[in-house]
Amino acid sequence: MATIKEIKTQLLSVYTLDDPLLVELSEDPRTGVQRLIKHKQKEINQLRLKEEAFQARFTLERELWSNGIDLVAGIDEVGRGCLAGPVVTASVVLDETFDLIDVNDSKQLSSELREELYAKILTEAVSVGIGVCSNQKIDEVNILNATKLAMREAVGNLNVTPQHLLIDAVNAPIEIPKTVMFKGDSKSISIAAASIVAKVYRDHLMRSYAALYPGYGFDKNVGYGTKQHIEGLKTYGVTPIHRQTFEPVPEFLIK
């Protein structure tokens, strides 16, 4: 009879509820074995639900592909509500072989998982484009128009020409057929991938600014108006990367 430690190792290669090993072990009276079985069954069910959710987020892309539209780009932005730094957008084109089931709305993921997925998306995507609109441009044209400009730039930086765009929330003036939707990063795998790329790219950028402008906590708040950030404004004033039209930044400008 196998030991519980040996059974635990054997279960590592079990991926379905009807696996013969699970059926066989269900007759084992040992409490430790039954505990392992329950844990494995829960793990399999969680993986199945994750896979089903992943496939559901691929629905929009598959519908377009089935109609001969092969190059579909998902677009998302990050940083619209920040007091400092640029707004960053990403455009990501995937194909049917893409299988990173953890890809989801970047806000739902840990920073560690985002970093891991970011590297894999850059490798596995058909193409990735980044668009960056500076804080100066944001002050000049407003955040919505700056976001649209960054989205155009992201699409222009793809190394393929997409036939259709899937965009989260913002109806960017790009002369390509598009579908604009709210909460797109939870409905489209391409938009979700774009949300991860944009988020991680911008986080890296803001961490580099933290070294240039210490005292604001940019490495942690990435430009959002946290208590530490506001205290930094009170103590050190406005930096060259602050958005001067965003409250409360104007309060700290030298008159």
Curated annotation (Swiss-Prot):
InterPro entries: RNase_HII, RNase_HII/HIII, RNase_HII/HIII_dom, RNaseH-like_sf, RNaseH_sf. A divalent metal cation binds at D76, E77, D168. Its EC number is 3.1.26.4. GO terms for biological process: DNA replication, removal of RNA primer; mismatch repair. Residues 70-255 form the RNase H type-2 domain. PROSITE patterns: RNASE_H_2 (PS51975). SUPFAM superfamilies: Ribonuclease H-like. GO terms for molecular function: manganese ion binding; RNA binding; RNA-DNA hybrid ribonuclease activity. Belongs to the RNase HII family. This is Ribonuclease HII. It comes from Pediococcus pentosaceus (strain ATCC 25745 / CCUG 21536 / LMG 10740 / 183-1w).
